[in-house]
UniProtKB/Swiss-Prot annotation:
5-phospho-alpha-D-ribose 1-diphosphate binds at residue 397. The modification Phosphohistidine is found at residue 228. Nicotinate binds at residues 36, 183, 225. GO terms for biological process: NAD biosynthetic process via the salvage pathway; response to oxidative stress. This is Nicotinate phosphoribosyltransferase. The lineage of its organism: Eukaryota, Metazoa, Ecdysozoa, Nematoda, Chromadorea. It comes from Caenorhabditis elegans. It catalyses: nicotinate + 5-phospho-alpha-D-ribose 1-diphosphate + ATP + H2O = nicotinate beta-D-ribonucleotide + ADP + phosphate + diphosphate. Belongs to the NAPRTase family. GO terms for molecular function: metal ion binding; nicotinate phosphoribosyltransferase activity; transferase activity.
Length: 562
C-alpha cells in the first residue's frame, strides 16, 4: 500500500490527502467505525426510518489542557472521507459475517448504494479557535447515513484538534521568535498517529518536522541533525575516512580535520575555557568533521554526547571556524540533556567571545542554539523565566502524545429528526445537548477581540452590529448580558452539498496562517494565559434559551414521591 500525495488522485478526479491510501486500501474507509453504527443502521433500515432527514452536531464539552481555547482541525480529512465513502464488495461480505444470519439480504443491497451525495456538511473554518458546545460540524442527511459516519468523523476531528491545540499552546509559551521543531514520530501512537501529529502540529504553530514522510505528503519543511549514535560511532581520528572538503568559492581541496585541529588549539589559547585540551574528545571532533564534510552549508552539531562545556562546544566552534575558512557557515548546535538554561547561557557567552576574536567572526554571536530533552509547556515557561539563550526547541513526546490530556472528547449528537428537535438529558447539566438546527456567530467588542459565541435557532433573524443582543447562558438563568457588538462573524459555511465541495478548501499553509490569526485576533491575553485563564463565554439567544428549557421540561420525567 502506498500513500498518495495531497495533489494526487485516487481515480483521476478526486484529490486525496495523506491519510488516505489507494482506493479501498484507505486507512479511512466505511468500516473504520464501531460495530454498533452498523447494527443501528440495520435497525433504522428494518423499521423504515433510515431515510428520515436528520441533523447531527459535532462538538466538545471542555477545552483541553486546562485552557480556554481549542483549535479546530481535521475538517478536510472529514470531507475527503465523505467524498470517497463507498462500501466495497469485500466490506459487504465482511458485514454479512458479523451481522446475524437472519439479517435480510436487501439490507446489503442498500449498503452498496450508500455514498455521501445526500449529505450536507456545514462547519467552522479549519484552523479556527473554537469553544465548548458550539458545533464544529453540522451534518444533515438521511438518518442511517449520518449515523454510519459518526465514529470516523470523531476519529478524524478529535486527535487532530487536540494535537493542533497542543502545538498552539507550545507556540504561545515559546513566543513568536523561537523556532519550534516537531520531533515526535518515534514516540507517536503508530505510523498514522505520527503522520497526523506532524501535519497538525505544523498548522498549530510548529515550523518544521523531523518526519520525512510527512514532509513528502504535506509539504512541511523537514529538519534534523544527528543522533548520539553518530557521534559515538567515531572513537578516534583514525576512523575518519574522508578529510578533504572543497573550498566553496575556489573549489580547492583542504583537510578539514587538520584545519579544525589547528583552530581548536588556537581557540584554547585565546581565552579561558572551562576545559583543558586533554578533556576535549578527538572522537567527537572526528564525528563533527565527518558531518560537516557531508553538510558544509547546513552544519548543526549535537554537542552533549560527552560534555557540553568541556568538549562539545570547543569541538563545535573549531569545526565551525574551519568551515568559515573554506567559505561555509555553520547553522548552530543542539543540546539534548542537562540544565538547558544554564548551558544555553554558557554557550551564548562563549559564542560572543568567539565573535570578538576577529571581525569576520561577528556572525558567531548569533549562532543558533537548539534545545531538546523531553520539553513541555512548563519547561519552556521556566526557561523563559530564567532568560535562556535558546533559539529553537525540538519537541517530541509531550507534543505528539498530548501527555497532559490524551483525548479531546468530541461528541456527535442527534439534534433534529424529521424537522423535530431532539435533546439528550442528563443529571450532569453539562451533558445536556442544545437541540435543533442552529446558526452560530462570533461577537466582537470595540477593542477588536471576541466577547462571546452566540447560538441561535435557524429561523431567527441575524444579529446586527451596534444593536443590543440579549445573550444567555444555556443553563444558568441568572447569567445573561446585553451585548453591543462592534463586529459579528458567522461561524459556519456549507462545505459539502449534493455530492460535491461547495467551499474551496485552504492549503495547509493557509490553515496555519489562520490558526495564528485566529488566536491572536480573537482571544484576549487573559483567555490565552497559562494559569487560570478567563473562560470564554458561549451563549444562546433568548428564543433558543426558551426553546431549550421548554423541550427539557417536556422530556424530563416527573418523579413521584410517596
Amino acid at each position: 500500500m502506498s500513500f498518495i500525495l495531497p495533489s494526487e488522485s485516487i481515480d483521476g478526479t478526486h484529490p486525496c490527502n495523506g491519510l488516505h491510501m489507494n482506493g479501498q486500501d484507505s486507512l479511512v474507509q466505511p468500516l473504520l467505525t464501531d460495530f454498533y453504527q452498523i447494527t443501528m443502521c440495520y435497525a433504522y433500515w428494518k423499521t423504515g426510518t433510515h431515510n428520515e432527514p436528520a441533523v447531527f452536531d459535532v462538538f466538545f464539552r471542555k477545552n483541553p489542557f486546562q485552557g480556554e481555547f481549542t483549535v479546530f482541525a481535521g475538517l478536510e480529512d472529514c470531507l475527503r472521507f465523505v467524498e470517497n465513502f463507498k462500501f466495497s464488495q469485500s466490506d459487504i461480505d465482511y458485514v454479512k459475517k458479523i451481522l446475524p444470519e437472519n439479517a435480510e439480504p436487501e439490507f446489503y443491497e442498500y449498503l452498496e448504494t450508500l455514498n455521501g451525495s445526500h449529505l450536507t456538511i456545514e462547519a467552522v473554518a479549519e484552523g479556527s479557535v473554537v469553544f465548548p458546545k458550539v458545533p464544529l460540524l453540522t451534518i444533515n442527511g438521511p438518518l442511517a447515513m449520518c449515523q454510519l459516519i459518526e465514529t470516523s468523523i470523531l476519529n478524524l476531528v478529535n486527535y487532530a484538534s487536540l494535537v493542533a491545540t497542543n502545538a498552539a499552546r507550545f507556540r504561545q509559551a515559546s513566543g513568536w521568535k523561537i523556532q519550534l521543531l516537531e520531533f515526535g514520530l518515534r514516540r507517536a501512537q503508530g505510523p498514522n498517529g505520527g503522520l497526523t501529529a506532524s501535519k497538525y502540529c505544523y498548522i498549530g504553530g510548529f515550523d518544521a518536522t523531523s518526519n520525512v514522510l510527512a514532509g513528502k505528503l504535506y509539504g512541511i519543511p523537514v529538519k534534523g541533525t544527528q543522533a548520539h549514535s553518530f557521534i559515538c560511532s567515531f572513537s578516534s581520528p583514525a576512523e575518519l575516512k574522508v578529510r578533504l572538503l572543497n573550498h566553496k568559492i575556489t573549489n580547492e581541496k583542504a583537510d578539514l580535520f587538520q584545519i579544525s585541529m589547528e583552530k581548536r588549539a588556537w581557540l584554547l589559547d585565546q581565552f579561558s575555557w572551562k576545559a583543558a585540551l586533554s578533556e576535549v574528545s578527538d572522537g567527537e571532533l572526528s564525528a563533527f568533521v565527518a558531518y560537516a564534510i557531508a553538510f558544509p552549508d547546513t552544519f548543526l552539531a549535537l554537542i552533549d554526547t560527552y560534555d557540553v562545556i568541556r568538549s562539545g562546544v570547543v569541538n563545535f566552534v573549531a569545526v565551525s571556524l574551519a568551515l568559515h575558512d573554506l567559505g561555509y557557515r555553520s547553522m548552530g548546535c543542539r543540546i539534548d540533556s542537562g540544565d538547558l538554561s544554564y548551558l544555553s547561557k554558557e554557550l551564548r557567552e562563549c559564542f560572543v567571545k568567539v565573535s570578538t576574536l576577529k571581525g569576520e567572526y561577528k556572525f558567531f554571536e548569533k549562532m543558533s542554539i537548539v534545545a531538546s530533552n523531553d520539553i513541555n509547556e512548563e519547561t519552556i515557561m521556566s526557561l523563559n523565566d530564567q532568560q535562556h539563550e535558546i533559539n529553537a526547541f525540538g519537541v517530541g513526546t509531550h507534543l505528539v502524545t498530548c501527555q497532559k490530556q490524551p483525548a479531546l472528547g468530541c461528541v456527535y449528537k442527534l439534534v433534529a429528526q424529521s424537522a423535530q428537535p431532539k435533546i439528550k438529558l442528563s443529571q450532569d447539566v453539562t451533558k445536556i445537548t442544545i437541540p435543533g438546527k442552529k446558526k452560530c456567530y462570533r461577537i466582537f467588542g470595540k477593542n477588536g477581540y471576541a466577547i462571546l459565541d452566540l447560538m441561535m435557532l435557524e429561523d431567527e433573524p441575524e444579529p446586527q452590529p451596534n444593536q443590543q443582543i440579549l445573550c444567555r447562558h444555556p443553563f444558568e438563568e441568572s447569567k445573561r448580558a446585553l451585548v453591543n457588538a462592534n463586529k459579528i462573524i458567522k461561524l459556519h459555511n456549507v462545505y459539502w452539498k449534493d455530492g460535491e465541495m461547495i467551499t474551496p478548501l485552504p492549503t495547509l499553509n493557509e490553515i496555519k496562517e489562520h490558526v495564528n490569526e485566529s488566536i491572536r485576533s480573537t482571544l484576549r491575553q487573559d483567555h490565552r494565559r497559562y494559569l487560570n485563564p478567563t473562560p470564554y463565554k458561549v451563549s444562546v439567544s433568548e428564543r433558543l434559551y426558551q426553546f431549550l428549557h421548554t423541550l427539557w421540561l417536556q422530556n424530563a420525567p416527573i418523579g413521584q414521591l410517596e
